[in-house]
Amino acid sequence: MSHMAYTPKKQVRTRNTHAAFPTLPIDEIVQCLPGLDCMVTEEELLRPTSKFVQSMYAQIATSLLGINRESMAPALAACAAGTEHPETQEDARMLFALQKPLYDLFVASGVTDYNISDILKPSPERLRVQLSAIINYARFREIREKWYEKMSEELNEEEEARTMRLKNQEEKLRRKVELIALIGDTPDQDLVEQHRINDSRKSELKRLHDQNLQLNDERERNKAELRVVVNRLRHKHQLMESLQEEVARLNSYVVDNPKNLQEEVVELSKRVKERETVRRMLGERVQKLDLSVDSFKDFQVDVSSCLSAFQKLSDEQEAHSKAVRKITTQKELLEHVGINSRQAEGRRDVLQQEIEAAESKIARIQQDMSESDRQTSRRMEELRRQIGTLDAERALVVQQNNTAQKRLAELENDMATERDRYEAQLKMAREEAEKLQTQFREYFVEVGRRLN
């Protein structure tokens, strides 16, 4: 690959003692890197490893330059053609392919001594300087753009002023030449020299004008690219903030202790079984309540029959009352007429006995009706209390059943969501493990090759 020429193995590192940017503290670097889609810790920056620096710089190249493994797949495939076991050298080829874009990015950021040893053998000091350069470049590129526009405007104004001065001088010289031609004198040596200087200045002005046009075109292109990069960085920063909270929440399940995942699944299964048991018990209780309601309906029919019987007793009591009134009327008639015959006396005695029997019967009926009224009232009051209790209990059971069913559905949805999420996390962890194994194999191959 052509870009390997500028990273020799024995290249000496040079320190940029007069950097055009401030070196940021570690904590500020950790806060700024999520804007470049890089999630790091202070411990990783203070003790960097080759693998960590390579993955971080690859992510920075993807965020700022739009370079990733997919965009470089054709070139990497062409390099891997004809080699044995190309998959073992895939990361190494990707590492070398990123050197030229990273070198250009660091040079644009103000770091001119970047080389591949900064990835293979990283040091905390140089890593801090390089990350400070990239962060300052990404943070203050708009300020540099304004400074560039200001300098371009000043250059344009200066160029216009010089053009006007040269045009005025040219006009004066042209008039002087015409005057000399009119008087027929030979132009002196100064005039010839002045023409030569004017020609050189014209060529210089033309060159500056072309250069200014090129700078303006480049500025317009850079402005559009910078706007796209800024919008993409803002969007990615928002996504990283939301993902950072999600990763922190899932970290205890996937990274710290994978057994927590299995325990959580077992706990969810137990809770689902408990909810199933509660729902079954509630169903049985609802069935019992339905039976109680049916019994109460039967009792209502019995009460209706009792009320009909009470109505009949009332009608009979009214008939007896009419008979009593009739007997009383007859008694009064007998008293007024004064019948003295035995038949009248006997009839009176019979009527008196009938009256007494009717009165006793009426009294007994009234007593029975009073007792029946009291018993019916007590029974009705007791039934009303039972109905209220049954209605309240049934409403409570129905509410508990609905709540249990809703909670069970939520638990099933949460369990399905958590299961999918855990499976995705486990899949990512397996892929990361496979990638680490591949890198270890490459590393051992590289170490073996160097030892040989």
UniProtKB/Swiss-Prot annotation:
User: Where is this chain primarily localised?
Assistant: nucleus
Q: Does the keyword Cytoplasm apply?
A: no
List, in alphabetical order, the GO biological process terms annotated in this UniProt record.
Answer: attachment of mitotic spindle microtubules to kinetochore; cell division; kinetochore organization; meiotic chromosome segregation; mitotic spindle organization
Cellular component, GO annotation: Ndc80 complex; nucleus
| Keyword annotations of the record | Cell cycle, Cell division, Centromere, Chromosome, Coiled coil, Kinetochore, Mitosis, Nucleus
As one GO molecular function, the record gives:
protein-containing complex binding
User: Where does the protein end up?
Assistant: Nucleus; Chromosome, Centromere, Kinetochore
Query: Could you list the residue ranges forming a coiled coil in this record?
Result: 152-280, 339-447
Q: Which Pfam families match?
A: Nuf2, Nuf2_DHR10-like
Gene3D superfamilies reported in the protein's UniProt record:
Ncd80 complex, Nuf2 subunit (1.10.418.60)
Q: What does this protein do?
A: Acts as a component of the essential kinetochore-associated NDC80 complex, which is required for chromosome segregation and spindle checkpoint activity.
Subunit record text? Component of the NDC80 complex, which consists of NDC80, NUF2, SPC24 and SPC25.
- Tell me its family: Belongs to the NUF2 family.
For this protein, the record's PANTHER family field holds: KINETOCHORE PROTEIN NUF2 (PTHR21650:SF2), MEMBRALIN/KINETOCHORE PROTEIN NUF2 (PTHR21650)
Q: What is this protein called?
A: Probable kinetochore protein NUF2
What is the scientific name of the source organism? Yarrowia lipolytica (strain CLIB 122 / E 150)
> Which taxonomic lineage is given here?
Eukaryota, Fungi, Dikarya, Ascomycota, Saccharomycotina
Q: Which gene encodes it?
A: NUF2
